[in-house]
Amino acid sequence: MSKKPVMLMILDGFGIAPKSEGNAVTLAKKPNLDKLFEKYPTSQLQASGLAVGLPEGQMGNSEVGHLNIGSGRIVYQELTRITKAIADGDFFENESLKLAMTNAKKTGSSLHLMGLLSDGGVHSHIEHLRGLLEFAKKEEVQNVYVHAFMDGRDVPPSSGQEFIEKTEKMMAEVGVGKIATVSGRYYAMDRDNRWERVELAYNALVLGKGETASSATQAIEKSYHDNKTDEFVLPTVVTENGNPTANIKNGDSVIFFNFRPDRAREITRAINDKEFAGFKRETLDLTFVTMTQYDKTLERVNVAYTPQTLSNTLGEYVSNKGLNQLRIAETEKYAHVTFFFNGGVEKENPGEDRKVIPSPKVATYDLKPEMSAYEVTDELLNRLDSDKYDMVILNFANPDMVGHTGVVEAAVKAIETVDECVGKIADKILEKNGCLFITADHGNAETMIDFSTGNPYTAHTTHEVPFVWVANDTEGKKLSNGKLADIAPTMLVQLGLEVPTEMTGENLIVNK
């Protein structure tokens, strides 16, 4: 018997904004999306700030977006959780953080604070570094070193100097800390098993080897001189009298202050895992603390803020009702439609199939804006013909990953590629008398020029995202505006299921 699948398609980084020369969404020729937006009920969803459990005015991101969509409720984000703990003072009583402080103090070893130096709020926040410096001062830790990972993606591409200055000022005010290394996130925060990049960051952090500079400021200046923006700063060791200021040694304490897991795992494994095989290196004996749980299977790490458990997420609930579901994406967004969508749970639910299509191996995605969208589409169409699935969750990575490059023409091509794929998928779902919801997790590709400077804008945005309901039975109905947390309840109603009490989102389908 033919199933009537209820499908959610997430166009990653596809926000709503007025037409402009920096809006790849409106510049793109997208006949399929235009037709669907015109013919079927559409509304707008909030995907940033308080509506997704982030601080007010904070841009959304993929992790947060998928958590909110998949759980059907506003999820209190780690950024907000940690910021609140610092403000309340609970932060300074955190047992795992205290463990790192005590070890460094008791043994006279060093305390290393490593993480993304930015106020982007996607992977980290510079105010959390301030909290750690204040904690170290309070605990009278003498040798405190900062290993700065430079951003340039969630903040402007060349804003690194400003964050270095901010950190230097912060350390002077608090009275503790020195910057020991500077590395672009391209190296220190890879998530695609490109161990040759990670190794360069590791060498700077642990061996004190790599590019050298007499100060963090000089490291950034040197990088800009070589036309490398923050993200691509080669791992650089800051020296004093020709020697490394500090490197991570046996017996030291390390606190990794990134709170988002996906780009923190590889360097953490490289430093800690005994069985690590990415490249040759010594295993150190450290007191290593991660701000949040990066991965349950990580060895020899302490977690400062353990995960909040979310029950009755969309995937779990549908599984408990005996329905089959498919999660499909390419590598770059696979964790988002699985781990994050399931509320931070790695294991799949019974009846949940997963398919990852490898992302292309290119240095930056403007070189191949199609990414693996066609392959994802072909795989999905084949699977829809199996009539196995009641629910399908798909993510197209293109608008976000190409949007991050700042190359408008490439982002336009990315969206045109996705539009072709949308057309084929919508036809197939309608043919099966199913229903397709199209949305995004946050904005990005709709704002690619910073008009105050004329420079490329590579970060996410606070714009609303579209919500479209494509089905054969939409006559006389419309969609209300809402937030990402309203998607799951809306889908459950289409699946003919009750909405569980844990889901505080609302069904957005209303009669006209």
UniProtKB/Swiss-Prot annotation:
Active-site residues from the entry: S62
InterPro entries: Alkaline_phosphatase_core_sf (IPR017850), BPG-indep_PGM_N (IPR011258), Metalloenzyme (IPR006124), PGAM_B_sf (IPR036646), Pgm_bpd_ind (IPR005995)
Binding-site residues, Mn(2+) 1: D400, H404, H460
Cofactor(s) needed by this chain: Mn(2+)
Reaction catalysis annotation: (2R)-2-phosphoglycerate = (2R)-3-phosphoglycerate
GO molecular function annotations of the record: manganese ion binding; phosphoglycerate mutase activity
Protein name, as recorded: 2,3-bisphosphoglycerate-independent phosphoglycerate mutase
Origin organism lineage: Bacteria, Bacillati, Bacillota, Clostridia, Eubacteriales
